[in-house]
Amino acid sequence: MRLRHIEVFHAIYTTGSITNAAKALHVSQPSVSKVLSHAEMQLGFKLFERVKGRLIPTEEASMLFNEVDKIYQQMRSIKNTAENIKKAEFGNINLSVTPALGFDALPCAIAKYHHAYPKVNFNVQTIHNNEALQALLEHKCDLAVVFSPSAMPGVKAIKIAQSELVAVFPKRLFPSIPAQLTFQELEGAEFIDISDSGPLGHLLWKRMLEENIVLDSTIKVQTYFIAARLVAQGVGVCIVDKYTAMGNLSDDIAIASFSPPLFFNVSALHLENKVLSHVLDAFLNELSNCI
């Protein structure tokens, strides 16, 4: 049996008539009848008997159907795969990003890109640095955008921006709001400690160690977001990435850079053996502009 024979046989068997099969296949009834006749001629036996206006499968057809159905399901799978490949011509962006970019930078980039290319599909999830490699290897994402990533085997890092750690503090803490601060100026303030904060935490503690700074802390949290929200409630001072700080500004809090600055890279990671699509390249440019 040819593939067309299988398609027509399956349609007639499951719908019960040539009329319904033609509708399901979006072809004419004579076309279905012709293909059925050709299939029966090649097989050397009848597949259906006409009984009171309906086509009833013969015993041979019923024996054949289970195998035909397996092939038909495979054909459907191939068709769906082909549709997905066709859809990728418009573009699919499977993206994992560090949560801080979700405040403004990522929504800004997606909105601008979607306006220009409305047929590109986005699938976005948040990720932490220690999850990036596994997410890429398991193809949960094509691209992971994180802060200051460590070198990973088989992974290429593309620097798309540079940012910095900043202090977030209540405005009442200083008579005039400084544009820059030193760690010495924060001594004595209640410090919100952010545990397990990855490479940015290492960057911060390295500087504090170099300057022999110890900040008093009675509150320890796991995320920059919670730390920033605590400051917004008037509790202490925290040091977070600039994106989290800007995303949580309010009338009563301010931010300041450090002197000297605590810079870090924003990098996009992808597997070395996988070439980025043109849509991903274009989106990275948009994201870089929004950052």
Curated annotation (Swiss-Prot):
Phenotype upon loss of function: The growth of the deletion mutant is significantly reduced with D-glutamate as the sole nitrogen source.
Expression induction or repression: Expression is up-regulated in the presence of D-glutamate.
Domain of life: Bacteria
PANTHER family to which the protein is assigned, alphabetical: TRANSCRIPTIONAL ACTIVATOR PROTEIN LYSR
Assigned protein family: Belongs to the LysR transcriptional regulatory family.
Presence of the UniProt keyword Transcription regulation in the record: yes
Keywords linked to the UniProt accession: Activator, DNA-binding, Transcription, Transcription regulation
Residues annotated to bind DNA: 18-37
Organism expressing this protein natively: Pseudoalteromonas sp
Domain (HTH lysR-type): residue spans on this chain: 1-58
The protein's name: HTH-type transcriptional regulator DgcR
Job description of the protein: Transcriptional regulator that positively regulates the expression of the D-Glu gene cluster (DGC). The cluster includes dgcN and dgcA, which are involved in a deamination-independent D-glutamate degradation pathway, dgcR itself, dgcT, dgcP and dgcH. Acts by binding the consensus sequence upstream of dgcR, dgcT, dgcP and dgcH.
Pfam family, one: HTH_1
